[in-house]
């Protein structure tokens, strides 16, 4: 009995004076471990009779419970103290500037496309989309291309191995294919633009095998070149934010328009004329191919290269730089997310 009380006092003295969890663990092993003091007392049970063993065993268990309670209480106190010390050491200074958050930027082609779409939306144009892989009818035949037209040749067009109705499939060479699909599936009047990727077998400073186009179409009664000239003129002035910009319409030829014109611009009278887009009145054969009566409805169409307009507006010299992925170039020419114009009212996708 006296030995048990002595062990309890010794445990209280040692455990209550410890300063850290490591020392507490050492005392736990000393008193309650496999070879500890309390375990040593339990070994004495074998030398006692049944009644003494019962009484002594009860006392040893109470001693063990008291020591465990002391250790548990001390452990909670030490853990709280260590947590406070850790929080004090890891204290965050809220006045220190935060690390700069990395965020992406807007590619010039995306920026330019959104600006172009926004301007056209002001004239009531909606958006139509179509597939990148097309058949011969939508890409050539319906647009009044003759069978021997150079654009149909392998060196100009990317043909695929697959076929549709025994006709070759190809990567569309213009987004005029969208106009054909829209006119076949709907009824006039139409007023929409068709933005998207197009593909031609060409590569130099001003051409890439893949490029972005926006083509526009208006089909209605009593449409004439005057309407086309007005839309193109106002569009150019709005996009380049220059009301004094000069335009000229040069006679040209496209299979799908008649008459046809190419549009040149110059920012001031000392600059050279720069070709920016093609346009014209929709050819009667095109209207016939999509089931529209050309004696009742007329149309105007135009097409432009997004990269071309981006180069002119943002002063980019080489078309190929758009697709090279040079981080230094992108850092210089890219735009922040808040620079993208929101799509104006009346524009639908």
Swiss-Prot record:
- By its UniProt entry, which PROSITE patterns does this protein fall under? AA_TRNA_LIGASE_II
Free-text comment on the cofactor = Binds 2 magnesium ions per tetramer.
**Gene Ontology molecular functions:** ATP binding; magnesium ion binding; phenylalanine-tRNA ligase activity; tRNA binding
Q: Sorted alphabetically, which Pfam families does this protein's record hold?
A: Phe_tRNA-synt_N (PF02912), tRNA-synt_2d (PF01409)
GO CC field? cytoplasm
Q: Which reaction does it catalyse?
A: tRNA(Phe) + L-phenylalanine + ATP = L-phenylalanyl-tRNA(Phe) + AMP + diphosphate + H(+)
Co-factor requirement: Mg(2+)
Could you tell me the keywords of this UniProt record? Answer: Aminoacyl-tRNA synthetase, ATP-binding, Cytoplasm, Ligase, Magnesium, Metal-binding, Nucleotide-binding, Protein biosynthesis
State its location(s).
Cytoplasm
Checking InterPro entries in the record gives: aa-tRNA-synth_II (IPR006195), aa-tRNA-synth_II/BPL/LPL (IPR045864), Phe-tRNA-synth_IIc_asu (IPR004529), Phe-tRNA_ligase_II_N (IPR004188), Phe_tRNA_ligase_alpha1_bac (IPR022911), Phenylalanyl-tRNA_Synthase (IPR002319), tRNA-bd_arm (IPR010978)
Principal localization reads cytoplasm
> What GO biological process terms are annotated to this protein in UniProt?
phenylalanyl-tRNA aminoacylation
- EC code(s) of this entry: 6.1.1.20
Binding-site residues for Mg(2+), renumbered to this chain: 258
Spell out the family assignment given in the record's similarity comment.
Answer: Belongs to the class-II aminoacyl-tRNA synthetase family. Phe-tRNA synthetase alpha subunit type 1 subfamily.
Q: How does it assemble?
A: Tetramer of two alpha and two beta subunits.
Protein's recorded name? Phenylalanine--tRNA ligase alpha subunit
Can you name the source organism?
Rickettsia akari (strain Hartford)
**Highest lineage ranks of the organism?**
Bacteria, Pseudomonadati, Pseudomonadota, Alphaproteobacteria, Rickettsiales
Question: Its encoding gene is what?
Answer: pheS
């Amino acid at each position: 009995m006296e030995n048990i009380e002595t062990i309890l006092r010794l445990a209280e003295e040692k455990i209550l004076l410890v300063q850290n969890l490591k020392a507490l663990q050492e005392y736990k092993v000393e008193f309650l471990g496999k070879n500890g003091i309390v375990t040593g007392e339990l070994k004495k049970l074998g030398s006692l009779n049944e009644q003494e063993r019962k009484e002594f065993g009860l006392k040893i268990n109470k001693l063990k419970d008291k020591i465990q309670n002391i250790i548990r209480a001390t452990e909670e106190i030490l853990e709280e103290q260590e947590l406070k010390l850790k929080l004090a050491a890891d204290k965050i200074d809220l006045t220190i500037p935060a690390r700069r958050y990395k965020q992406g930027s807007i590619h010039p082609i995306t920026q330019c496309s959104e600006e172009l779409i926004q301007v056209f939306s002001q004239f009531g144009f909606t958006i139509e989309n179509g597939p990148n892989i097309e058949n011969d009818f939508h890409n050539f035949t319906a647009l009044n291309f003759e069978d021997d037209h150079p654009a149909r040749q392998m060196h100009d067009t990317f043909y695929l191995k697959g076929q549709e109705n025994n006709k070759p499939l190809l990567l569309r060479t213009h987004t005029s294919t969208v106009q054909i699909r829209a006119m076949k599936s709907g009824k006039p009047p139409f007023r929409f633009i068709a933005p998207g990727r197009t593909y031609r077998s060409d590569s130099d400073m001003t051409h890439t095998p893949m490029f972005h186009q926006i083509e526009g179409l208006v089909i209605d009664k009593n449409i004439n070149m005057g309407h086309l000239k007005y839309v193109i003129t106002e569009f150019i002035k709005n996009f380049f934010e220059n009301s004094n910009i000069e335009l000229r319409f040069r006679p040209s030829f496209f299979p799908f328009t008649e008459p046809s014109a190419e549009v040149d611009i110059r920012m001031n009278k000392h600059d050279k004329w720069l070709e920016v887009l093609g346009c014209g009145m929709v050819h009667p054969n095109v209207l016939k191919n999509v089931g529209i009566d050309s004696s009742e409805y007329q149309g105007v169409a135009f097409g432009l290269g997004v990269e071309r307009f981006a180069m002119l507006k943002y002063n980019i010299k080489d078309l190929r730089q758009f697709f090279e992925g040079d981080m230094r170039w992108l850092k210089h020419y890219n735009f922040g997310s808040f620079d993208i114009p929101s799509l104006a009212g009346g524009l639908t996708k």
